[in-house]
Amino acid sequence: MALWGGRFTQAADKRFKDFNDSLRFDYRLAEQDIQGSIGWSKALVKVNVLTIEEQHQLEQALNELLVEVRSNPQAILQDDAEDIHSWVESKLIDKVGNLGKKLHTGRSRNDQVAVDIKLWCKQRVIELQESVRNLQRHLVQTAENTQQAVMPGYTHLQRAQPITFAHWCMAYVEMFDRDYSRLTDAYNRMNTCPLGSGALAGTAYAVDRDSLAHDLSFAFATRNSLDSVSDRDHIVELLSIASLSMAHLSRFAEDMIIFNSGEANFVELSDRVTSGSSLMPQKKNPDACELIRGKTGRVIGSLTSMLITLKGLPLAYNKDMQEDKEGIFDALDTWQNCVDMATFVLDELKVNVERTREAALKGYSNATELADYLVSKGVPFRDSHHIVGETVVYAIEKGKGLEDLTIPEFRQFSEVVGDDVYEILSLQSCLDKRCAKGGVSPLRVAEAIAEAKTRFA
């Protein structure tokens, strides 16, 4: 049953109907459409469109429909309704007869879909935050278990300074914490109810929109009807948050792929998140991480698509806006799946402590410590930087580490070097000295872990 047939003298061509209909994807808004319809029925009582008895009858029927939807949402797709709004109204009329035709009084599909998608987005934010928080908890647990795992830290993918695997884990805790807080910010901005805005100019019935907003668990009603039905900022914002978080996940995945390589051998991924080769029997491929990395472009593509869709639209509603749903549905599903998979990857991750330490001892990652040592002896840092650079070249030529050089060898480059230099060149000293807040010293990392465990409890 179409909701708009009276104006037309010819039926829509099947080709157009197939092109125009959205039930195949907006069926996911069924629960929200029913929720909004129950709220609207209560508002209509207050403006004398419905009696209390009629509203109770409608609410009972809508709740029955809600139970049916929750038990088998895919059954909706067997219908040929244009969209989820048409489907809900049709099923309601089947249950209560002509009374069901009164429900749409004063309401447009424009404000109806606007409230549906906001309700859906609000629920998804809550679910996504729980997934992100769960990933953070797993990162913190992994950090707690790997505080003694010294490894190289990298810049430009070159060994730079020693860190611990725990410090690496806690870096991602911080990234995902920003994603979590962005979801909170987005939730607060989208927590406004557009229902009662009509097609664009507001409803002709004196509906108490503030009361309606509270009934539907919104903070307050939107302030401008024209903006209310054309606003898709919340979708763009969620797509933006998803895209940025996927970039964080992609970096996590890339690190894991590198750490898991035979050349690095820092970690071993579980058999349960890897796959083999159809030709090469020895292969164990990090497919979970590669798919996380690969799906990032898919989510970013949804953001780009939505921005381009909106950029030239005149006020207020345009059918172009129907294109908002498939992108947001797919992007948030993909994001949550990737967050959950990253959590699963951490579950049985094995860190090769011996190998990470061996790698940390190579690459002259203690060179900065030698420069700081010279500064402590009164050498200006810029001079000490140059001196250490020359010392490293010498050590490379001799096939030695800095800690293996003799005092006479050190003094070829600076006379201030004494026997106390060896103490500061050890891995432990390199870590311990980074004791400012946020640094890699074991004390600071332990503090960060304890603070995060308290925060995420």
From Swiss-Prot:
Keywords: Amino-acid biosynthesis, Arginine biosynthesis, Cytoplasm, Lyase. One of its GO terms (molecular function) is argininosuccinate lyase activity. Pathway: Amino-acid biosynthesis; L-arginine biosynthesis; L-arginine from L-ornithine and carbamoyl phosphate: step 3/3. It catalyses: 2-(N(omega)-L-arginino)succinate = fumarate + L-arginine. Signal peptide: none annotated. Pfam families: ASL_C2, Lyase_1. It comes from the Bacteria. It is an enzyme of class 4 (lyase). Transmembrane segments: none annotated. GO terms for cellular component: cytosol. The keyword Cytoplasm applies. It is found in: Cytoplasm. Its EC number is 4.3.2.1. GO terms for biological process: arginine biosynthetic process via ornithine; L-arginine biosynthetic process. Belongs to the lyase 1 family. Argininosuccinate lyase subfamily. This is Argininosuccinate lyase. It comes from Haemophilus influenzae (strain ATCC 51907 / DSM 11121 / KW20 / Rd). The lineage of its organism: Bacteria, Pseudomonadati, Pseudomonadota, Gammaproteobacteria, Pasteurellales.
